A protein has these predicted regions:
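Polysaccharide-binding and catalytic clefts of secreted carbohydrate-active enzymes
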Residues: 97, 109-296, 300
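N-terminal carbohydrate-binding accessory modules
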Residues: 1-46, 59, 74, 396
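Aromatic-lined substrate-binding rim segments of carbohydrate-active enzymes
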Residues: 33-41, 48-112, 237-244, 469
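Short, acidic/polar
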Residues: 25-40, 132-138, 255-265, 330-338
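The substrate-binding groove and active-site-proximal loops of carbohydrate-active enzymes
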Residues: 16-26, 52-67, 114-133, 155-162, ...
């Protein structure tokens, strides 16, 4: 077998659980025993404990109370339930803010925060670092060998930035280490524009609405600095935990669509990835677009650790209370969306939270146990049903996703694109564009890794780089080597425009990729909303492109150098100009798509490439609209998750040799999937 090792030797199956906050119920101690009995009923085998417990653990400075936590961990262990034990830095006690105001953040507008909320501490504060070191050390010394503890949940949803004097000084120190001299910094930031040249390090301030926000290199470096800050703070939290027991793995929960930090760098501090997923199901009539978006983020979380299974640390079995509408999941959707995570590489399904809070800001957030106090509810029964399903899938734990396709979704590129001021200030739609390129593979059941531009390209047959506006040093050389050795690279409009400082490449776009792509991009036309062009395949083109395909937003005007045109624009003054090209390069090919084309184009183009490269599919059958197949494998067996994201039943024909993972019965064709249904099949690999 070829599986990843479990998170902990105690773990032999998939995990099922939730955030558990027993400190909220200290005035009703009978609830704890009732909760644990219901956890067993739902086949939960893990709980995240202590995430926001600092005020309970240290009610007064230097006065610690661990007795309640001792009881909780012992009771959970006795019931066969493991624990991700949290460090409590996500929210600090009021006494700390009152006595040490330097732990409070200062906003971008330079206004200090008051005590309240969460995730708003200054990561530069020596006091906060001292206090987190102290509480983490005590937790590690007391619990790192507790038999219930599987690993550490570091803080919670790190986010945000601080602009206090301490952070300004750390930022300047970070810049000195990066650039060495002010001359180098001024050159990288092109600060001669508008006479913004710096003559002393003390003149540099973080971006501010009443100060400097026009230097894009500064803005980029501020993002990078904040990533370095949180990574350093995370390592600071981890150090005493590893000192007590180096074998316990550590994680912190990431978030979807998150903008503040570069998760690729923060991931290096962690042993495994966990994240919080809250799709707004049933917002649109067609669920497939959201299902595709969510699948892409699952794939990114898996890719952050080279394909290692991740933990779905938070989700909701019902509705959230912080999104615009608190829409209930239709019957079956909770199980379907949870199994989607497992299909894409999760070895757990967990919720926020186990029991609904009685008061405060998330009292109406979905949970397993509602205010009624039991799980004989629609949601409770679905959670129990999912627990039963997960308990029957021990073979899936640790299985791999074998992706021969990678799509680059690069956070530094995202920051630079959004800040560039042109060519489309209405929004460059980077995430949406990446997902539009991901979708044809998801629909066909072709596995995809979602990577950043610094990841090794050699494991893949096909790499797609939508709008890789920023090409950092080294990427072009690696891309050329990848294609020369037989790989296929697809780029798009607005690629190869700037370097890592957001300085435009001179000598013609796409900059250092010009030789590989065999084109020169002279101009780019931004279409008004509601304005469209068309792209038409040339007769006999090697992809079989036909069309016309509708084009929106962006049309790049390119010249052929060594490439071959496959399709051209049909309208406007650039009618007849190349719109899709391919350049033979060594043993491989470099493709370029010069315009933002419709889904029909994406399907035709990437289906052609998939056939040319004989990319493996999860299952060799035609899938009806709304039905997708996702596979994991242990090397001997493949586990196929057939998912129906529509409100209609669908019937499909299966090849021979499949068995149902839950019943071990042979699966005969045709197979019918009910609305919001998921079937898990096994075949010999």
């Amino acid at each position: 077998m070829n599986k990843f090792a479990p998170l902990h030797p105690k773990v032999s199956t998939l995990l099922h659980g939730a955030d558990y906050n027993p400190e909220q119920w200290e005035n009703d101690p009978d609830i704890i025993d009732k909760d644990i009995a219901m956890m067993q009923q739902a086949k939960c085998n893990v709980m995240s404990v202590g995430i926001f417990s600092w005020a309970k653990l240290e009610p007064h400075e230097g006065v610690f109370n661990f007795a309640w936590l001792d009881i909780i961990l012992d009771k959970l262990y006795a019931a066969g339930i493991h624990v991700f034990l949290a460090t409590p830095s996500g929210a600090r006690p009021a006494w700390m803010s009152q006595r040490y105001p330097q732990v409070l953040r200062v906003g971008r507008d330079r206004v200090p925060a008051l005590h309240g909320g969460r995730h708003n501490h200054c990561m530069s504060s020596p006091v906060y670092r001292e206090k987190t070191l102290q509480i983490n050390t005590l937790l590690a010394e007391r619990y790192s060998s507790h038999p219930a503890v599987l690993g550490w949940h570091i803080s919670n949803e790190y986010g945000g930035e601080c602009h206090c004097d301490l952070c300004q000084n750390r930022f300047r120190d970070w810049l000195k280490a990066r650039y060495q001299t002010l001359e180098n910094l001024n050159q990288a930031w092109w600060s001669t524009f508008w006479s913004h040249t710096y003559t002393d390090w003390s003149q540099i301030e973080s971006p501010a609405p009443q100060g400097e926000m026009s230097i894009h290199g500064l803005n980029l470096d501020w993002h990078r600095f904040n990533t370095a800050q949180v990574t350093d703070f995370c390592r600071h939290e981890i150090a005493p935990l590893k000192a007590a027991n180096a074998s316990l793995p550590v994680t912190t929960n990431f978030m979807e669509y998150f903008y503040d930090y570069d998760y690729w760098q923060l991931a290096e501090a962690l042993d495994f990835i966990s994240w919080d997923s809250y799709p707004m199901w049933h917002r649109d009539k067609d669920e497939t677009a959201l299902a595709c978006y969510t699948a892409m983020y699952h794939d990114m979380m898996r890719s952050l650790k080279g394909g290692k299974p991740f933990v779905l640390m938070e989700s909701t079995p019902g509705a959230t209370n912080w999104q615009p509408t608190s829409k209930l999941k239709k019957p079956g959707m909770h199980i379907l969306s949870s199994l989607q995570a497992v299909a894409h590489g999760a070895d757990s399904v967990q919720y926020f939270q186990w029991r609904k809070s009685r008061g405060s800001v998330e009292k109406f957030h979905g949970a397993v146990v509602d205010h009624v106090g039991h799980i004989d509810t629609r949601i409770g029964r679905e959670v129990c049903q999912l627990g039963e399903i997960l308990s029957k899938l021990p073979e899936v734990r640790g299985c791999r996703t074998e992706a021969k396709v990678a799509i680059i979704f690069d956070q530094q590129n995202r920051w630079a694109l959004d800040d560039a001021q042109g060519p489309r200030n209405l929004g460059m739609e980077y995430e949406k564009t990446v997902n539009e390129h991901y979708r044809p593979f998801w629909e066909q059941g072709i596995a995809v890794d979602v990577i950043d531009a610094d990841v090794d390209l050699t494991p893949y047959q096909l790499v797609i780089a939508p709008m890789l506006y920023m090409v950092r040093d080294g990427f072009a050389g690696r891309a050329e080597a990848f294609v020369a050795n037989g790989g296929h690279l697809v780029t798009t409009y607005w690629t190869g425009i700037v370097n890592e400082s957001d300085l435009c490449y001179l000598g013609g776009f796409p900059g250092p990729l010009r030789n590989l792509l065999g084109i020169w991009a002279e101009e780019i036309d931004c279409l008004n909303d509601g304005e469209f062009n068309l792209v038409q395949g040339l007769a006999g083109n090697q992809c079989g492109l036909q069309g016309p395909y509708q084009v929106r937003h962006l049309c790049e005007l390119i010249h052929i150098e060594s490439a071959q045109a496959l399709a051209t624009y049909r309208d406007d003054f650039y009618a007849g100009r190349p719109a899709v090209t391919v350049n033979a390069f060594g043993k491989g090919k470099a493709w370029h798509v010069a315009s933002r084309n419709d889904l029909a184009f994406q399907r035709d183009f990437f289906t052609a490439l998939s056939k040319e490269l004989a990319l493996p599919r999860a299952i060799a059958t035609e899938l009806p609209p709304g039905v997708v197949a996702t596979a994991r494998t242990d090397g001997d067996n493949a586990f196929i998750f057939l998912q129906n994201y529509s409100a209609q039943n669908h019937t499909l024909t299966l090849p021979q040799g499949y068995r149902d993972c839950l019943t071990d019965a042979a699966v005969s064709a045709p197979l019918t999937l009910s609305a919001w249904d998921c079937r898990i099949l096994r075949r010999h690999a």
